Amino acid sequence: MVILTKEASMVRQALLANGLEPFLRGEERLGIEARKRRIAAHMKKIMTLLNLDLADDSLAKTPYRIAYMYIEEIFPGLDYANFPQITLISNKMKADEMVTVRNITLTSTCEHHFLMIDGKATVSYIPKSNVIGLSKINRIVRFFAQRPQVQERLTQQILLALQTILGTNNVAVSIYAVHYCVKARGICDSTSTTTTTSLGGIFKSSQNTRQEFLRTINQT
């Protein structure tokens, strides 16, 4: 049984309590390598049904590459054992102004078609008793992006995770992204983008603070 860090457990429970963990079925009994083998076996069947020749040198290892990619590279955010180690620093400097990390690169996967979501996030918070190591914000964004997602939920998950870890509601998150389920199929719109915003605490209650955050997002 995997023992989660305190922060990972807190975040998981907060998301479950708020209906923001709709898919996770509990602890996976199969080991990682066993899951890879099963995914590869199913992928072979799919490729065969597509009339692809798995004896071809270029395709022979594709089922295994896809299995590895799903478990190790694209979807590690499904396992809270991979939640980033969090560094909190006591706010001895009494910082009480907005801290913002802009242009956080994220790559996620549309849960409806398993196609790419390619975007950037901006995260702001106003410190209370602790501040967080800046790179940890990027890592939290990446963790929740590395799972099948819809952008609206992803934005809310990042917000609630940071509120839980930092012990303050004063957090704001905005994500700007291109969805390849729109760009590469269906309507095939190659220019549209989607922006989602989730605001907490003073970012929601104070028009001035909200506008300051929105101006930060729009900076070039």
Curated annotation (Swiss-Prot):
GO biological process: one-carbon metabolic process; tetrahydrobiopterin biosynthetic process; tetrahydrofolate biosynthetic process
Keywords: GTP-binding, Hydrolase, Metal-binding, Nucleotide-binding, One-carbon metabolism, Zinc
InterPro entries registered for this protein in UniProt: GTP-CH-I_C/QueF (IPR043133), GTP-CH-I_N (IPR043134), GTP_CycHdrlase_I (IPR001474), GTP_CycHdrlase_I_CS (IPR018234), GTP_CycHdrlase_I_dom (IPR020602)
EC number in record: 3.5.4.16
One Pfam assignment: GTP_cyclohydroI
Binding-site residues for Zn(2+), renumbered to this chain: 110, 113, 181
One MF annotation (Gene Ontology) recorded for this entry: GTP cyclohydrolase I activity
Catalysed reactions listed for this entry: GTP + H2O = 7,8-dihydroneopterin 3'-triphosphate + formate + H(+)
PROSITE patterns according to UniProt: GTP_CYCLOHYDROL_1_1 (PS00859), GTP_CYCLOHYDROL_1_2 (PS00860)
Subunit annotation: Toroid-shaped homodecamer, composed of two pentamers of five dimers.
Family the UniProt entry places it in: Belongs to the GTP cyclohydrolase I family.
PANTHER family: GTP CYCLOHYDROLASE 1 (PTHR11109:SF7), GTP CYCLOHYDROLASE I (PTHR11109)
Name of protein: GTP cyclohydrolase 1
Organism: Baumannia cicadellinicola subsp. Homalodisca coagulata
